[in-house]
Amino acid sequence: MTWTAPPGSRTRHGWNTPVTAPGPENREMLKRFREIQHNPLNFLLQTWQLHGDVVQFPIPRPASYLVSSPQGARDVLVNNHRAMSKRTIQYSTLSLVTGEGLLTADTETWKTSRRQLAPAFHHEMISLATNHVATALNRLDQNWAELTSEGSALIDVDQTMMNLALEITGATLFGSDLTGQVDQLTSATLRALHGVVVRARNPLPMPLAIPTPNNLGMRKAIRELDTAVNAIIDRRLADPLPPGSPIRDMLDVLMDQTLEQPLSRKQIRYEVATFIVAGHETIASALTWAWYLLGSNPEEAQRLQVHPERAALVFDETLRLYPPAWVITRRTLESVEVEGFLIPADALVIVSPWVVHRNERVWPNPELFIPDRFANGAPMLGYLPFGAGPRLCIGRDMARLQGAQILSHISQNWQLSPIHNQQVPVDASVTLRPQGGLPMRLTRIKD
């Protein structure tokens, strides 16, 4: 599937010189301020629908743009990636929790970390990780069997998928058994990320050292995460993998002191925290929404139960409708042209996969859950749940494989049914999560 500009649309080939992008006036922004704060997904979608593929907001510093076309997203993330920085308020605020890890780092720090982490995400390592997923799923089966020993049970799928994803992340990437810490770690993660969102949406955030209620909560959550991260590192230092071990997890790669540029203890902490916070939260979000969509589309749930190989299609379509990373931001280092429009240096550029994935030029009936869209693979343009370009998520292949494995296994053994037919509201936090959790009825599928 490919994307082409519709007749009469403005493309880079239609301009002799780039022009200024259109956008809403101050009055419209003031009227929609509450929506910006409380329903940013709808705000971004309607802004694109009202004003077009490249929109300039009436904000003087920094000049801010929304880019919503598939080609525009490619211009930002691929074609002009060297002219883009991650030094935005969103990533800077997140780095208060994770440090300058792979997700938030810029330029040389990112290049060093990416190069060093690459061996941990080779295909052989990803295949070996399926054993850890199987172990975690076996433990989940045992827990659910106890819950349903006298019939069905009501569970919070959101919390369950968070715990499962964290357990798998600990075993796969760090060789650590986190089963006794999942409740504490997921709680600390959610509280830290809540603090990130509050700060990012505050036009005048107070320095973290100022004891506001939000800052105090953030600092406490960060201390708890630091304690857990340092314990993971210390356990490996006390019990390292044997020299020359053919099986190397991410932590072993991070701590390799034989490299030309070995990472410092601080940088190792940053990367471990990044994958604990961002890594497990992302796959947990996708799995939660997959069960919501399957519960809302019982015919697709039945097809998955009969044909478990469809799990990859279900996972990919879930990532289209509910991309965990629903907004990607960049700051321009120099003026660039995007879809024929001029974006100046030092501007904030927003690319929202939530909006791009609802473009009818790429996705007919975009609001419908249709896993078969991916029967022939994803389109080259218009699908970016893991970003695009050099900053494409390093864990993409692992996340897709693990997501499909989890969906396939659970759908063969368990039925998750909605307890009501109402649409679940979306909490657009650092990732997309259901407001108030996702209660569903758990029933064992009889052999």
Q: Where do the language-model regions lie?
A:
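Cytochrome P450 fold signature focused on the C-terminal beta-domain
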Residues: P240-I247, A301-E309, L321-G340, I350, ...
